[in-house]
Amino acid sequence: MQHPPFYKSCRRALFGLFVLSMTAPACLAGQVSVEVKGDYPALQDNAEAFMQEIEGRSEAGLRRYVSTAKGQVQTALKALGYYEPVIDWEILKPEGDEGPAQLSLTVEPGKPVLVRSRKVEIMGPAGDDPAFNLFLPSKPVVGDVLDHGQYNALRQTIQNLASRLGYFDGKFLTRRLAVNPEEHAADITLEFQSGERYRLGDVRFIEGHGFETSLLNQFVTFESGGVYHSDKIAKLSSDLSNSGYFSSVDVDATPSSAEGGVIPVVVALRTRPPRSIAGGVGFSTDVGPRLRGNWREHWINPMGHRRGAETELSQPRQNVSVWYELPLDPPMTDSIRFSAGYQQEEIEDVESQLLTVGQQWNHQLDSGWLQTASINWEQERYRFGDGSTDQSRLLLPGLGYSLLEADSAFDPSKGYHLSLEVTGAHRALLSDADIAHVLASAKGLYTVADNHRFLTRLRVGAVATNRFSDVPPSLRFFAGGDQSVRGYGYETLSPENSEGVGLGGRYLLVGSMEYQYEFAK
C-alpha cells in the first residue's frame, strides 16, 4: 500500500507523550531552554520531554546544535497535532563571561491539525461482539486536535481486545493515519478483520500434584468449548494460587497449540510444604501485651482437607482453638469447618470460662455476600463481681451474612464491610435459656489525597429473652476500647447493678467516626 509523503513523515518517532500536572514557562535542559508561547501546557510538557540535556558546549557548538534542537521541538509538537510551529532561537551570553552560553528556543505553535474523518470498521465476528465494541476508545473524534497518542491507543486497543477475547487470527487490512499539514486535516482509517473467535478446550492437570482431579476440576469455572477470554485463564490461575495448596501455578493456554480453533488448557502445579507454624508478640491498648501462635496443615489428604490450631495469650484473655476444614464446590469460597475452643477471660467485673464446639458452613452467594450457617454448643462458667459462679449450656444455631468491598486486600484506601448475625437457643433444644441474639455491624474507610483517612463504625445489637439473668456474658453487650468507643477501657461500658458492677446490656448501639493522617509511609 502506497502512502502519501506527508503520511510517511508523520509516522516517524512521534508517539511519546509525557504529561505532567504542573507547567512551567520554559524548560532548561543544561544549556538549552524552550518556551511555548500561549496557554499550551501539554505542548510545553511534551517539548520538555523531548529535549535532550546538553552541557559543555561552546557558543559555536550551540549554533551547530540549533537544527537538532529545533527538530526535537518539532517532533514534540507534531505528536500533539501542531505541524507548523514557528521556532525562533538565540544564543544568550553570560554576563561577564561567567558560565556557559545558553541556547534559547521560543515557539509559536501555529494552527493545529484537526481530525477530519474517522473510519473504524471491525469486520468478522468481532464486529457483532458487544464485549469487543464496548471497550473501543471514543477518542479521537472528528473535530479534535490530532493527538498521535490517542490514535496509537485506539489502534493498540483493537489489537489488545482481539488477544484478550480470543480473536487470534485478527489483522488490520487498513491502518492509516493520513495527515495533510497544508489543509490542517487528518484522516483516520482502521479496518480490522477479526477472524473466528477461538474456544477453550478441556483442562488437563499434569500429574504429580498429589490431589484428586475431582477437587482440581472444581477450580475450573468455564465450560469446555466455551469462547476464549483471557480473564477465564487469569481467574483459574489466581484461584489455584490463592487456594493455599500450591507454591507455584502455571496455566498454559497458548493459541499456537490450538486444533480447529480449540485451545487445550494445561496446568502444572507444585505443591507447597504441607505444614507451617507462625507466632508473634504484640501490644494493643485493649488487652496490653499479647502472644499469638498458630499451626496449620494446609492439606492432609488428596481431597484437600486441612486443619489447624491457634492460641492467643494476654493478661485479660487466654484462648486456644482447633479446627478441621473440608472444601466444597466451589472450593475458592465454600467450605465446612468443624471447630472446638476454650477461652478464659477476666475483664473488669466479669470472669468467664467458655468452651465451644461447633460447625460452620460457608457459602458465597451470586451477589457476593458470604453466607455462614452454624451450629455451636457452648458451656460457659461465669461470675459478675463478687457474686456466685453461674453456668449455662446452650445449643446455638445461627445464620450470618457478610460483605467486604475494598480496593486492595492488603492496604485498602477505600472500602466497606457489612455483617449481620442471628443466633438463638431454646430450652426444648438442649439449652438452659430461651435466647434470640442479633448483631449487625458496618465499617467504612475512605482516603482523601493519599494521607487523609476517614474511618466510620456502627454496631447495633439486641438480645430477646424471657429471663435476662440466664444470658451468659458472651451473649450480652459491652462497649469500650479501640474498636468500639475510644477513651474507655476494653468492654468496660455496660449497665451496672446497685453495687456498680457491670452486667452487660440487652441492647447495643455504638457509632464512631475517626480521622487519621499518615505522616510517613
Per-region residue spans from a language model:
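Bacterial N-terminal signal peptides that target proteins for export
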Residues: 2-15
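Periplasmic polypeptide-binding modules associated with outer-membrane biogenesis and secretion
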Residues: 29-42, 52-285, 294, 308-326, ...
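Transmembrane beta-strand segments that form the barrel wall of outer-membrane beta-barrel proteins
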Residues: 220, 275-285, 293, 297-299, ...
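C-terminal outer-membrane beta-barrel translocator/porin domains of Gram-negative envelope proteins
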Residues: 242, 390, 394-521
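Outer-envelope beta-barrel architecture signal
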Residues: 261-263, 273-277, 289, 303-307, ...
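Outer-membrane beta-barrel strand-turn architecture
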Residues: 271-273, 299-301, 328-330, 363-367, ...
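Solvent-exposed loop/turn segments connecting transmembrane beta-strands
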Residues: 283-290, 311-320, 345-354, 384-391, ...
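Transmembrane beta-barrel wall of Gram-negative outer-membrane proteins
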Residues: 320-393, 397-399
